[in-house]
A protein has these predicted regions:
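Membrane-interfacial amphipathic/re-entrant helices at transmembrane-helix boundaries
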Residues: 1-20, 52-68
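Function-critical hydrophobic alpha-helical transmembrane segments in multi-pass membrane proteins
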Residues: 13-29, 38-39
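Helix-capping/transition residues at the boundaries of transmembrane alpha-helices
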Residues: 29-30, 106
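Alpha-helical transmembrane segments
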Residues: 39-222
Length: 222
Protein backbone atom coordinates (compact mmCIF):
# COMPACT_ATOMS: atom_id res chain seq x y z
CA UNK A 1 0.00 0.00 0.00
CA UNK A 2 2.84 2.41 0.76
CA UNK A 3 4.14 1.93 -2.78
CA UNK A 4 0.83 3.21 -4.09
CA UNK A 5 1.20 6.43 -2.14
CA UNK A 6 4.61 7.40 -3.51
CA UNK A 7 4.11 7.29 -7.26
CA UNK A 8 3.86 10.96 -8.20
CA UNK A 9 0.14 11.60 -7.75
CA UNK A 10 -0.88 14.55 -5.59
CA UNK A 11 -1.40 12.87 -2.25
CA UNK A 12 -4.51 14.80 -1.26
CA UNK A 13 -6.33 13.80 -4.45
CA UNK A 14 -5.12 10.25 -4.01
CA UNK A 15 -6.39 10.00 -0.45
CA UNK A 16 -9.78 11.36 -1.54
CA UNK A 17 -10.02 8.78 -4.33
CA UNK A 18 -9.06 5.94 -2.01
CA UNK A 19 -11.60 7.13 0.56
CA UNK A 20 -14.29 7.22 -2.13
CA UNK A 21 -13.31 3.70 -3.19
CA UNK A 22 -13.71 2.39 0.36
CA UNK A 23 -16.96 4.26 1.02
CA UNK A 24 -18.37 3.38 -2.38
CA UNK A 25 -17.54 -0.31 -2.07
CA UNK A 26 -19.05 -0.47 1.41
CA UNK A 27 -22.30 1.03 0.16
CA UNK A 28 -22.37 -0.95 -3.09
CA UNK A 29 -22.11 -4.18 -1.14
CA UNK A 30 -24.99 -3.08 1.06
CA UNK A 31 -27.17 -2.10 -1.90
CA UNK A 32 -26.52 -5.43 -3.62
CA UNK A 33 -27.53 -7.49 -0.58
CA UNK A 34 -31.13 -7.89 -1.69
CA UNK A 35 -31.79 -11.59 -2.30
CA UNK A 36 -31.03 -14.78 -0.42
CA UNK A 37 -27.40 -15.86 -0.55
CA UNK A 38 -25.98 -13.23 -2.88
CA UNK A 39 -23.93 -11.33 -0.28
CA UNK A 40 -22.56 -14.49 1.35
CA UNK A 41 -21.66 -16.25 -1.90
CA UNK A 42 -20.05 -13.08 -3.21
CA UNK A 43 -18.07 -12.80 0.03
CA UNK A 44 -16.86 -16.39 -0.19
CA UNK A 45 -15.57 -15.84 -3.73
CA UNK A 46 -14.21 -12.30 -3.29
CA UNK A 47 -12.29 -12.97 -0.09
CA UNK A 48 -11.16 -16.35 -1.39
CA UNK A 49 -9.63 -14.63 -4.42
CA UNK A 50 -7.98 -12.01 -2.20
CA UNK A 51 -6.51 -14.81 -0.07
CA UNK A 52 -5.12 -16.53 -3.16
CA UNK A 53 -3.25 -13.44 -4.36
CA UNK A 54 -2.03 -12.40 -0.91
CA UNK A 55 -0.39 -15.75 -0.20
CA UNK A 56 3.31 -14.89 -0.04
CA UNK A 57 5.98 -17.53 -0.69
CA UNK A 58 3.76 -20.30 0.70
CA UNK A 59 3.52 -18.45 4.00
CA UNK A 60 0.40 -17.07 5.65
CA UNK A 61 0.43 -13.33 6.27
CA UNK A 62 -2.00 -10.99 7.98
CA UNK A 63 -4.07 -9.93 4.93
CA UNK A 64 -4.22 -13.55 3.78
CA UNK A 65 -5.42 -14.70 7.21
CA UNK A 66 -8.01 -11.92 7.33
CA UNK A 67 -9.27 -12.78 3.84
CA UNK A 68 -9.50 -16.48 4.73
CA UNK A 69 -11.33 -15.60 7.93
CA UNK A 70 -13.85 -13.44 6.08
CA UNK A 71 -14.42 -16.09 3.41
CA UNK A 72 -14.94 -18.81 6.03
CA UNK A 73 -17.28 -16.53 7.98
CA UNK A 74 -19.42 -16.00 4.88
CA UNK A 75 -19.42 -19.76 4.31
CA UNK A 76 -20.56 -20.33 7.88
CA UNK A 77 -23.36 -17.80 7.47
CA UNK A 78 -24.52 -19.23 4.12
CA UNK A 79 -26.67 -22.13 5.46
CA UNK A 80 -28.77 -19.61 7.41
CA UNK A 81 -29.35 -17.43 4.34
CA UNK A 82 -29.37 -19.88 1.44
CA UNK A 83 -31.30 -21.28 -0.39
CA UNK A 84 -34.05 -19.85 1.81
CA UNK A 85 -33.19 -17.10 4.30
CA UNK A 86 -33.73 -17.75 7.99
CA UNK A 87 -31.33 -15.01 9.07
CA UNK A 88 -30.43 -11.79 7.24
CA UNK A 89 -27.01 -10.17 7.14
CA UNK A 90 -28.42 -6.66 7.49
CA UNK A 91 -26.79 -3.32 6.76
CA UNK A 92 -24.05 -3.76 9.35
CA UNK A 93 -22.95 -7.12 7.96
CA UNK A 94 -22.96 -6.16 4.29
CA UNK A 95 -21.27 -2.79 4.87
CA UNK A 96 -18.60 -4.56 6.95
CA UNK A 97 -17.92 -6.99 4.09
CA UNK A 98 -17.63 -4.17 1.56
CA UNK A 99 -15.38 -2.12 3.83
CA UNK A 100 -13.10 -5.07 4.61
CA UNK A 101 -12.87 -6.07 0.96
CA UNK A 102 -11.85 -2.58 -0.18
CA UNK A 103 -9.26 -2.27 2.58
CA UNK A 104 -7.81 -5.68 1.69
CA UNK A 105 -7.58 -4.71 -1.98
CA UNK A 106 -5.42 -1.72 -1.06
CA UNK A 107 -3.48 -3.72 1.52
CA UNK A 108 -2.33 -6.50 -0.81
CA UNK A 109 -1.78 -4.38 -3.93
CA UNK A 110 1.77 -3.41 -4.87
CA UNK A 111 0.85 -1.20 -7.83
CA UNK A 112 -2.15 0.34 -9.56
CA UNK A 113 -2.45 -2.59 -11.96
CA UNK A 114 -3.13 -4.83 -8.99
CA UNK A 115 -5.59 -2.37 -7.45
CA UNK A 116 -7.73 -2.52 -10.60
CA UNK A 117 -7.41 -6.30 -10.93
CA UNK A 118 -8.15 -7.09 -7.30
CA UNK A 119 -11.03 -4.61 -7.10
CA UNK A 120 -12.43 -6.49 -10.09
CA UNK A 121 -12.96 -9.50 -7.82
CA UNK A 122 -16.22 -7.72 -6.94
CA UNK A 123 -17.01 -6.89 -10.58
CA UNK A 124 -20.67 -8.07 -10.73
CA UNK A 125 -21.59 -5.86 -7.77
CA UNK A 126 -19.78 -2.82 -9.19
CA UNK A 127 -21.30 -3.32 -12.65
CA UNK A 128 -24.87 -3.88 -11.49
CA UNK A 129 -24.86 -0.94 -9.08
CA UNK A 130 -23.17 1.39 -11.58
CA UNK A 131 -25.74 0.59 -14.25
CA UNK A 132 -28.63 1.15 -11.86
CA UNK A 133 -27.19 4.55 -10.92
CA UNK A 134 -26.75 5.52 -14.58
CA UNK A 135 -30.30 4.45 -15.41
CA UNK A 136 -31.73 6.55 -12.60
CA UNK A 137 -29.66 9.58 -13.60
CA UNK A 138 -30.93 9.27 -17.18
CA UNK A 139 -34.51 9.03 -15.90
CA UNK A 140 -33.98 12.06 -13.68
CA UNK A 141 -34.75 10.11 -10.51
CA UNK A 142 -33.34 10.95 -7.10
CA UNK A 143 -30.52 8.59 -6.15
CA UNK A 144 -31.55 8.68 -2.48
CA UNK A 145 -34.91 6.97 -3.11
CA UNK A 146 -34.95 3.14 -2.72
CA UNK A 147 -35.50 1.19 -5.94
CA UNK A 148 -35.57 -2.30 -7.43
CA UNK A 149 -33.77 -1.70 -10.70
CA UNK A 150 -30.66 -3.82 -10.15
CA UNK A 151 -30.45 -6.65 -12.64
CA UNK A 152 -30.54 -9.26 -9.87
CA UNK A 153 -33.76 -7.68 -8.51
CA UNK A 154 -35.38 -7.65 -11.95
CA UNK A 155 -34.51 -11.31 -12.45
CA UNK A 156 -35.93 -12.23 -9.04
CA UNK A 157 -39.01 -10.01 -8.91
CA UNK A 158 -40.07 -9.71 -12.55
CA UNK A 159 -38.82 -12.96 -14.07
CA UNK A 160 -39.50 -14.98 -10.91
CA UNK A 161 -36.14 -16.74 -11.09
CA UNK A 162 -35.27 -18.47 -7.82
CA UNK A 163 -32.97 -16.44 -5.59
CA UNK A 164 -30.49 -19.30 -5.24
CA UNK A 165 -30.08 -19.58 -9.01
CA UNK A 166 -29.33 -15.86 -9.37
CA UNK A 167 -26.91 -15.89 -6.43
CA UNK A 168 -25.02 -18.89 -7.81
CA UNK A 169 -24.86 -17.30 -11.28
CA UNK A 170 -23.43 -14.08 -9.84
CA UNK A 171 -20.90 -16.08 -7.81
CA UNK A 172 -19.75 -18.19 -10.76
CA UNK A 173 -19.51 -15.14 -13.02
CA UNK A 174 -17.53 -13.35 -10.31
CA UNK A 175 -15.16 -16.32 -9.97
CA UNK A 176 -14.50 -16.47 -13.72
CA UNK A 177 -13.85 -12.73 -13.88
CA UNK A 178 -11.52 -12.98 -10.88
CA UNK A 179 -9.48 -15.80 -12.42
CA UNK A 180 -9.21 -13.83 -15.68
CA UNK A 181 -8.04 -10.68 -13.87
CA UNK A 182 -5.40 -12.58 -11.89
CA UNK A 183 -3.92 -13.70 -15.20
CA UNK A 184 -4.11 -10.12 -16.52
CA UNK A 185 -2.44 -8.27 -13.64
CA UNK A 186 0.97 -8.09 -15.36
CA UNK A 187 -0.19 -7.06 -18.85
CA UNK A 188 -0.23 -3.32 -18.19
CA UNK A 189 -2.80 -0.74 -17.17
CA UNK A 190 -4.24 -0.30 -20.68
CA UNK A 191 -4.89 -4.01 -21.08
CA UNK A 192 -6.54 -4.24 -17.66
CA UNK A 193 -8.78 -1.24 -18.25
CA UNK A 194 -9.67 -2.58 -21.70
CA UNK A 195 -10.59 -5.97 -20.24
CA UNK A 196 -12.75 -4.40 -17.53
CA UNK A 197 -14.44 -2.18 -20.13
CA UNK A 198 -15.29 -5.17 -22.33
CA UNK A 199 -16.65 -7.06 -19.33
CA UNK A 200 -18.75 -4.04 -18.39
CA UNK A 201 -20.07 -3.78 -21.95
CA UNK A 202 -21.02 -7.46 -21.85
CA UNK A 203 -22.79 -7.07 -18.52
CA UNK A 204 -24.53 -3.93 -19.81
CA UNK A 205 -25.79 -5.83 -22.86
CA UNK A 206 -27.26 -8.59 -20.70
CA UNK A 207 -28.81 -5.97 -18.42
CA UNK A 208 -30.33 -4.15 -21.42
CA UNK A 209 -31.74 -7.32 -23.01
CA UNK A 210 -33.55 -8.46 -19.86
CA UNK A 211 -34.96 -5.03 -19.07
CA UNK A 212 -35.93 -4.34 -22.68
CA UNK A 213 -37.76 -7.65 -22.85
CA UNK A 214 -39.58 -6.73 -19.66
CA UNK A 215 -40.63 -3.35 -21.11
CA UNK A 216 -42.02 -5.03 -24.22
CA UNK A 217 -43.90 -7.57 -22.11
CA UNK A 218 -45.45 -4.82 -19.99
CA UNK A 219 -46.50 -2.87 -23.11
CA UNK A 220 -48.22 -5.96 -24.52
CA UNK A 221 -50.12 -6.45 -21.26
CA UNK A 222 -51.39 -2.88 -21.46
Amino acid sequence: FQDLMTKGVVWIVLYVLLALFIIGTSNFYNFMDGIDGIAAITGIVAFGLIASVSWNNDQLNMPCLLAIGMSVSCFGFLPFNFPSAKVFMGDVGSILLGFTFSVLVLWVSNNWNEVLCFAGFLFPFYADETLSILERIIRGEALTIPHRRHLYQVLANEYNIAHWKISIFYGLFQLLVGILLIQMKDVGIVGIIGTLFLLFCGFSFINFKFKRKLQIRNLIKQ
